[in-house]
From Swiss-Prot:
GO cellular component, one term: cytoplasm
Active site (UniProt): 188 (proton donor/acceptor), 318
Cited Pfam families: FumaraseC_C, Lyase_1
Native source organism of the sequence: Salmonella typhimurium (strain LT2 / SGSC1412 / ATCC 700720)
Job description of the protein: Involved in the TCA cycle. Catalyzes the stereospecific interconversion of fumarate to L-malate.
Name this protein carries in UniProt: Fumarate hydratase class II
Subunit details: Homotetramer.
Main location: cytoplasm
Protein family: Belongs to the class-II fumarase/aspartase family. Fumarase subfamily.
Gene: fumC
Length: 467
């Protein structure tokens, strides 16, 4: 039999498991929102703890909170940040759209734990109050968006950007290493004029470099914090210096460039910063999907596909076809990119649907945002380690396909004109001839002229990979 204790909120008393630190409002949420399995992300829980820690420190500094209470709240928050009490945050994403219940979940846990630190008990006789002390100078309406931005910015800076930079570096190295390998290009899935493998990969590098700039450009808006706006953005019940000082405290303890939002009404009423930042992440997903698809097409085979590059063979690919090996890293990346694009639709809908002074789609928005960051960061790390770093050219196959291409005839345009060059290509294709044989048979040029004018290595231009 589960031992319980009585907890009380503005709606009255309710029984709570005696071994849990949470209180009445958390218990009500557990009972009223038994929806699916998605819980508040751990990084969001930690961001809430950071927010409460900073608020307690600033409230103490401003003379609004007793030093012993502030110290106990800070210690309790540090325990949460250290990974303790992880099972004290059981609430579903699918709850109130303001995140109020998760804010109160944190308030109740920290209040009960702080009370114990001060020698008191958890429950209605506790020494620290979840609203009056832990939530002092705050509202769920400014706390939750603040925690969203803290979690989002830290995830981008600490996880996604390093992995994006690492993958970019790997592909840049490959681009330089393969700069002298001339291969056939392809447009519309048809043969086109030559380029080097290094040039082809340099396009991927530039895509990722642009994506990094777009993501970094979104960070200053994400760094703006709503804390201090309280209920509707007016700052009701806060000290005049509170908003600025609490943002500075969060910047200090996270070593991140957080600032107080210049307009708290925007900060509470919208999720625009995360909508825009996620748009940059969706752009990254689009680029990664293109790169992964190019890699698996170029590596297709081993005997009946394009086969211009080889990628690492990591695991068996079929339960029925012996010896088959598949481009599994590419497949994982393309799947997660699809999920990111779906997340973007949900975030756009949530961001567009806030009414008046408060957006109430916040738990869904941050859940999808953090999932996107995790998927992209983990996906790039895996793709880099198990695929991109092991890409190698199949020089024999590249040369074979290059020599068989009819599009080398493009080099003759400036010598004999487009129409005659097209006639050479069509005759070669129809009769199964080489371009040279077709050109000589038509009498448009000699063997020597063909060899002098149709030189794939001179058709790739002067574009240096990486520029």
């Amino acid at each position: 039999m589960v031992t319980v204790r009585r907890e009380k909120d503005s709606m009255g008393a309710i029984e709570v498991p005696a071994d849990k630190l949470w209180g009445a409002q958390t218990q009500r949420s557990l009972e009223h929102f038994r929806i699916s399995t998605e819980k508040m992300p751990v990084s969001l829980i930690h961001a809430l703890a950071l927010t409460k820690r900073a608020a307690a420190k600033v409230n103490q500094d401003l003379g609004l909170l007793a030093a012993e209470k502030a110290s106990a709240i800070i210690q309790a928050a540090d325990e949460v940040l250290a990974g303790k009490h992880a099972d004290e945050f059981p609430l579903a994403i699918w709850q109130t759209g303001s995140g109020t219940q998760s804010n109160m979940n944190m308030n109740e846990v920290l209040a009960n734990r702080a009370s114990e630190i001060l020698g008191g008990v958890r429950g209605m006789e506790r020494k620290v109050h979840p609203n009056d002390d832990v939530n002092k100078s705050q509202s769920s309406n400014d706390v939750f968006p603040t925690a969203m931005h803290v979690a989002a910015l830290l995830a981008l800076r600490e996880h996604l950007i390093p992995q994006l930079s690492a993958l970019t570096d790997t592909l840049r190295d490959k681009s330089h290493a393969f700069a002298d390998i001339v291969k056939i290009g392809r447009t519309h899935l048809q043969d086109a004029t030559p380029l080097t493998l290094g040039q082809e990969i340099s396009g991927w590098v530039a895509m990722l470099e642009h994506n990094l700039r777009h993501i970094e450009h979104s960070l200053p808006h994400v760094a703006e914090l709503a804390l201090g706006g309280t209920a509707v953005g007016t700052g009701l019940n806060t000290h005049p210096e509170y908003a600025r000082r609490v943002a500075e405290e969060l910047a200090t303890i996270t070593a991140a460039p957080f600032v107080t939002a210049p307009n708290k009404f925007e900060a509470l009423a919208t999720c625009d910063a995360l909508v825009q930042a996620h748009g940059a992440l969706k752009g990254l997903a689009a680029s990664l999907m293109k790169i992964a698809n190019d890699v698996r097409w170029l590596a297709s085979g081993p005997r009946c596909g394009i086969g211009e590059i080889a990628i690492p063979e990591n695991e068996p690919g079929s339960s029925i076809m012996p010896g088959k090996v598949n481009p599994t890293q590419c497949e994982a990346v393309t799947m997660l990119c699809c999920q990111v694009m779906g997340n973007d639709v949900a975030i756009n809908m949530g961001g567009a649907s806030g009414n008046f002074e408060l957006n109430v789609y916040r738990p869904m928005v941050i859940h999808n945002f953090l999932q996107t960051v995790r998927l992209l960061a983990d996906g790039m790390e895996s793709f880099n380690k198990h695929c991109a770093s092991g890409i190698e050219p199949n020089r024999e196959r590249i040369t074979q396909l290059l020599n068989e291409s009819l599009m080398l005839v493009t080099a003759l345009n400036t010598h004999i004109g487009y129409d005659k060059a097209a006639e050479i290509a069509k005759k070669a294709h129809k009769e199964g001839l080489t371009l040279k044989a077709s050109a000589v048979a038509l009498g448009y040029l000699s063997d020597e002229e063909f060899d002098a004018w149709v030189r794939p290595e001179l058709m790739v231009g002067s574009m240096t990979p990486g520029r």
